[in-house]
Amino acid sequence: MEFSASLRDNKVMRWSVLAITSLTLFASYFFTDVLSPLEDMLIRDLHWDGSQYGFFSGQYSFLNIIGFIILGGVILDRLGIRRTGLWFTILMLLGASVKYYALTSYFNNGGFGYDFFNSFWVDFKPSVKLASLGFMIFGLGSEMAGITLTKVVVKWFKGKELALAMGLQVSVSRIGTAAVFVIAPAFAKTGGLTSPVIFGLALIFIGLLSFIVYMIYDLKLDNQVQGLLAGEEEIFRWSDMTKVVANRGFVYISMLCVLFYACVFPFLKFATNLMINKYGVSSDIAGEIVFILPFGTVLLTPIIGYFIDRKGKGASIMILGSILLVLVHLVFAFLPGNIYFALGGMFILGVAFSLVPSALWPAVPKIVPDQYLGSAFAMIFWVQNIGLWLFPMLIGSVREWSNPGVSAALQEGKDVLFDYTAPMFMLVLVGVVALLFAILLRKADASKGYGLELPNERK
């Protein structure tokens, strides 16, 4: 169905909408990784260890993996973009505030709630438990806000520059991730551990205000089209789940998604520490090396998306990106601690992280019929969050297992280093499985005719 002339037909207006909502997305991704370059400070100042840090990092996805993200999808379908986006952006702010409070000296010196969080699970610090609670609340709000913002892009760009707009949206999220590895260490050096966290909290508040501004334009658009847009949106039905999971191509692309992303985002939470321990650089330099990955994706993702939109080859591009992923983690696992290997590895990982997402997300509508698309995206995000929850804990646990006594020595102020061979080799194995699913997806495309190798044209 074509939309009647409306605000969305005004090129300046729809790109302005993308810019406004991108502030919310930027804030979400910045705050998600704000502590990633600061693990050494968490160990030294708050006496966390690798397992506790890994546990905390994984809690971002906990509420999502137990089904709340699917419930959120139902809420989005039932209540629409405005109310859903507002509620979950507020939830982001709430979770971020709890996480910040858990890291403050007031709380850790016996402030409100300390005794309660110290009364159970005594092997973990109270700050770990409260920060994890805040992070899981934030994670639910962040993921649902992200899905809502994706729906915003579809609403305003359908039939127009949709692929480019989605590519730019991905780029904004990568800028948010990249900024952490430059800004957070600098802020922490001058203002302490909580300084970059409160900066991220301020960004979340600005993102909330930005979404409120967007709501005004969204209401105007709905009034103009008189329900045409709402009429095209699919209502989530539980019965759709069985039809979706019976689709072999959907299973392959979902597994590729969870395994590929599990080798990137959880890795980033340990990447700064890897650079410090294996390559012998300072925390500032380590953050700048890690910055290469998201910065590279900012530039490459829209370009690759533009290419796929017009030339196709999506399935082949996913295979290529998966091969690069395996090679990168082999470099980090086994090659010597030469800084040039670190620089080259992060650059190639950035290329891989541009190739696969650029091809993966536009492929979903080719594999899944339109009437099940809402259910499909909810399930993919759900499976992806399982990986984002599980793998930080796995990486942290494998690192602790392969480095007995190192965290304890660091807490005592001793000059010791982590060996990252074992956790990186684990990611190599995960990457190999991701590559196998990319190959299976290419074969399924050849037999089922999904059109993944064809340009991204609407069916």
What function would you assign to each model-found segment?
Residues 128, 134-172:
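Cytoplasmic helix-loop-helix junction between adjacent transmembrane helices
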Residues 58-74, 291-304:
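Central cavity-lining transmembrane alpha-helices of secondary-active solute carriers
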Residues 35-39, 247-301, 391-395:
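Extracytoplasmic gate region of multi-pass secondary transporters
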Residues 77-89, 309-323:
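Cytoplasmic membrane-interface "Motif A"-like loop-to-helix N-cap segments
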Residues 90-123, 323-337:
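C-terminal ends and interior cores of transmembrane alpha-helices
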Residues 314-360:
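C-terminal transmembrane helical hairpin of 12-TM major facilitator-type secondary transporters
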Residues 195-214, 421-439:
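Symmetry-related core transmembrane helices of the 12-TM Major Facilitator Superfamily/SLC fold
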Residues 215-240, 447-457:
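Flexible cytoplasmic inter-helical loops of multi-pass small-molecule transporters
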